[in-house]
Amino acid sequence: YLIHSMSTKKGNFEELEEISAFNFRNAIQKTRARQVVYLSGIVNEEKLSKHLSSRKNVEGILSSGSYALTTLRAGIIIGSGSASFEIIRDLVEKLPVMIAPRWLNTAAQPIAIRNVIEYLSGVLLNEQTFNQSYDIGGPDIMNYKQMLLTFAKVRGLKRRIGVVPVMTTKLSSYWLYFITSISFSLAKNLVDSMNFKVICTENTLQDL
């Protein structure tokens, strides 16, 4: 289950995600499926963003089905198609100098998309993972500024980044909207989440 609705321009994305989860659960229960694998977000903060709170709510809905649920909770996924990665790539490739918001100092534990795919395929019909939740992440913990500079180094680009202490969520969202390829609604929801640490509390899945 890979669905999210943060890009929606109409209505409340949390309500839409809830409805989608209920519809999916009800449809799957009419089949002979033994397991559902849900790719969620790391939710180890006491105070959650709307995005991560919705992810947690969806997990609760999916777990109430007649099948076994396996939840993989990831932070920043590094790879084409990941909204967070698209932001990193667009910012680095378009801006030689950045005056950026303070959430660039927020710590996260990124994971490569190839590793996410390995985990997703590895838990399929693995009964040890039935009705279990796992945090998945790479070996490095870094902030968003470090991610930008690391990507710039890989691309062979020289970039300078200055972080300002004050920049509202709305202003940050417009900054991403005008510079990157993502929609304003997605930018706003992601900026809200980027103020919260996303670090694994454990990663026992790699031992299975």
Where are these regions (language model features)?
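Active-site beta-alpha turn of Rossmann-fold NAD(P)-dependent dehydrogenases/reductases
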Residues: 3, 37-41, 73-75, 137
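Conserved catalytic Lys-bearing alpha helix of Rossmann-like short-chain dehydrogenase/reductases
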Residues: 18-24, 54-65
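NAD(P)H-binding glycine-rich loop region in Rossmannoid oxidoreductase-like domains
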Residues: 1-31, 41-47
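Conserved catalytic-site region of short-chain dehydrogenase/reductase
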Residues: 42-53, 76-82
